[in-house]
Amino acid sequence: MLRRFFLCGAAAVLSGCDKLGTTASSNAPSFRAVDITGAEYARQLDLVDQNGQPRTLADFKGKVTVVYFGYTQCPDVCPTTMSELAQIKKSLGKEGDRLQAVFVTIDPERDTAAVLKAYMAGFDPSFVALRGTVAQVTAAAKEFKVFFAKAPGASDGSYTMDHTAGSFVFDAQGRVRLFVRYGAGIEPLTADLKTLLGSS
């Protein structure tokens, strides 16, 4: 399953790489993650958070924001990603107040507002979870070039979710800058986030 995740993540990145040639600068910072600055996607996100408040990407301007698409019943990739973000936020100390994690559920049928609220609280109370109707979530995933699909579970009627395993990083001005592949490691991501925090 992870192989599929990586392939989908790579496809999401490659689809934006051909946009970079016209926007890259010789003075641009060097990142460990994939630099997608200037990508013509991941520009809109219009869903509702775990407290029932409508949210858009504009709400997170002023902070370096990491957006991740996943689901709460994910057994490995999703909790690992959110746990790493919580560790990074804590390690940044006061600077961590300018880092915002946003979790977008791809399983709104099971991930109710209450479920998402409890899930985020298990990592960091400042983390935001977003949900919508299946149609709204599908539209959001399409905007970010994120793949997801139901997969049969171990028992009758149960299911898991196949999905792109990676995060999108926005700078404090609200511009998408990086795609971070799952498994990239805490240290490289921390370094990239510090670079963006330092330039904001």
Where are these regions (language model features)?
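N-terminal targeting signals for export/organelle localization
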Residues: 1-44, 48, 196-200
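A short acidic/small-residue loop/turn micro-motif
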Residues: 16, 62-63, 183-186
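Short loop/turn microsegments at loop-to-beta-strand junctions
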Residues: 42-43, 65, 164-166
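A short beta-strand-turn-helix
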Residues: 45-65
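Short active-site neighborhood of thiol/selenol oxidoreductases, capturing the structured segment around
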Residues: 58-79, 85
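Sec/Tat-exported extracytoplasmic proteins
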Residues: 64, 71, 89-96, 123, ...
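Structural microenvironment flanking redox-active thiols in thiol-disulfide oxidoreductases
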Residues: 80-140
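Thiol/disulfide oxidoreductase modules built on the thioredoxin-like
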Residues: 136-192
